[in-house]
Design a protein with these regions (language model features):
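Hydrophobic ligand-binding cavity/cleft-lining segments
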Residues: 1-37
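Hydrophobic pocket/interface hotspot
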Residues: 17, 27, 51, 69, ...
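A short, structured loop/turn motif at beta-sheet edges
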Residues: 14-15, 70-77, 100-110, 143
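Hydrophobic/aromatic beta-strand elements that line small-molecule binding cavities or substrate pockets
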Residues: 8, 41, 65-71, 95-103
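Short amphipathic alpha-helical signal-transduction/dimerization elements
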Residues: 135-143
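Beta-strand/loop substructures that line and gate deep hydrophobic ligand-binding cavities in soluble
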Residues: 81, 85-132
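Glycine-rich portal/gate segments that line the openings of hydrophobic small-molecule binding cavities
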Residues: 39-81
Length: 143
């Protein structure tokens, strides 16, 4: 199993960053790597329960993932399971994602994305590239 951790700093208080990374209206602006959009979704990470999204790339290829929001501790953290679906819509290997937010200075926040339980180093590298791209979009939105 492989894990990855990414960190960013935002010039906003934890409450605002938490909203950016959990609420549907904000998630849809940065969810998915650059060049991909959200085609279908049940995407609300602000409360426990099931979630899913289908991304579409520039060529029209679909990429579905889903999971369960396990814990929500506003404005500090949210944790959820993560699994990709294959072409027959069968959900594959399950991993976990955790977003952690803490105050940084008077009005900023440190954001940490921790993705654990990835099946191997190649998967971790692919997710690192994907999440890094997503976070660039989030930085433009929330920066």
């Amino acid at each position: 199993m492989s894990d990855l951790t990414l960190e960013r700093t935002f010039p906003h208080p934890p409450e605002k960053v938490f909203a950016f990374v959990t609420r549907t209206e904000h998630l849809l602006s940065w969810w998915g790597p650059e060049g991909m959009g959200v085609r279908e979704h049940e995407l609300d990470l602000s409360r426990p329960g099931a979630w899913s999204s289908t991304l579409v790339n520039a060529e029209g290829g679909l990429h579905k993932m889903s999971g369960e929001v396990l814990s929500v501790d506003p404005p500090r953290s949210v944790e959820f399971t993560w699994g990709w679906h294959d072409d027959k819509d069968v959900r594959g290997h399950e991993s976990r994602v955790r977003f952690e937010i803490e105050p940084d200075g008077e009005s900023g926040s440190k954001f940490r994305l921790i993705h654990t339980g990835l099946p191997d180093d190649e998967s971790a590298a692919n997710h690192d590239r994907g999440w890094t791209s997503c976070l660039r979009k989030l930085e433009r939105l929330a920066g």
